């Protein structure tokens, strides 16, 4: 800990420095005088008043005098009101017992207001569930957008089961962010997912402009390969063929966990910035209907709500909450525990680490993240790791399962029904072309990640558990006390434990145990509440 500054700095300085400052001040004042002389002196304009030639001069003067008197009376009245308010506050100073009763009465009167405010403000998670149900009911085809870096972890069995039970609806998987995984891994995942559902390789465009500025700056835009959309033609062909087979206008719903790129897929299909996109999770709060053409309409939806019964890694990657709510050290440590250590060291250019706390310390020193006093800011390093892993720049990948085992809500008959009506051979050719066009990540930007499997979500708003206001306040007070007791201890407890043991010397092993005398003194003090110095020290 840095020692506090007990003395103020001395104002003594060398004569050279003092004369230099005085000279600069004189020069500055001289320049100001020179500029003021150039501008000239302007006399303030006096109010000429009401001219004698003006009609109703006396009436105007009387009105002005009346307004002046009214302002004076208003000031006097405000002064009296302030004095009365101060007098009332002095009389309210009563005994502590009466004050306690006043506080209780005030709390009782505030209780109906709290209930009314709570009833008026609905839980946003429940609103998300309601909007998701609306999107599924209104859709003929449901596009489940998956992150190609962890496709299995982005699948929600509850949503897929709801689509299957609806009867005539189709479900299509969209592997977005396909440029962030190696091509071999992408092909393996495509073969695995195609056994269940039609899967489209996709890479959303990042070169879209706003509607108003798109036409103006169209000629100046130079499209790079990383900004070009891949898989748009395959998805358009799939939707168009299904619309022709139905013979009617269709609606396509887009669902998925936060930050998988649902709105980016819609913007890429429309070739305009229609839906709001960004780095933050959960930007889309309600369903948004976007017409793609005369026959096809696409519906954007809010993100899926993850169930709290999932693994810590899934909660860290797919919770639509800020990093402060998730606790940065816990979230980043859970992610780091599933990543390959050697590739993490190569990506972040840090030495080998023993545990997550050691890694965050080295990363903070490497990136120049320091607290007051020069100690490494471990929490900022954890936030940096979390933002990179939940963003769209880091290239990590997972291996698909060795063999395909259908889940409880899926079997071969359902898979055949979902594939019916689509030209799968043409889809396979389009996917192969998209993989060939894509440019995979660099070798130093590839990190092997162990997926935690399917991620459970919440579709029914009744399953969302709400905390009472009293529990929330108690929780906040407990957190404040924890933070006050010691930030360092809290940080160490949040991180995964170190799997390292060392032998203690006899002196160290007995250092933590209280001596017999001290324990006897503690027992005596506990038995007798009245503390007598004469018996203990004389």
From Swiss-Prot:
The keyword Nucleus appears for this protein: yes
GO MF entry, a single one: GTP binding
Alphabetical keyword list: Acetylation, Coiled coil, GTP-binding, Isopeptide bond, Nucleotide-binding, Nucleus, Phosphoprotein, Ubl conjugation
Binding-site positions, GTP: 176-179, 256-263, 300-303
Keyword Acetylation appears in the UniProt entry: yes
Region (Disordered) residue spans: 1-57, 69-126, 460-538
Compositionally biased intervals (Basic residues): 1-45, 114-126
Biased composition range(s): Basic and acidic residues: 69-93, 460-475
Ranges of biased composition (kind: Polar residues): 506-518
Family, per entry: Belongs to the TRAFAC class YlqF/YawG GTPase family.
Chain's role: May be required to maintain the proliferative capacity of stem cells. Stabilizes MDM2 by preventing its ubiquitination, and hence proteasomal degradation.
Domain notes: The basic domain (B) allows nucleolar localization in the absence of GTP. The intermediate domain (I) inhibits nucleolar localization by the B domain and is required for exit from the nucleolus. Exit from the nucleolus to the nucleoplasm requires both the I and the acidic (A) domains, and may be triggered by GTP hydrolysis.
Name of the protein in question: Guanine nucleotide-binding protein-like 3
Designated gene of the protein: Gnl3
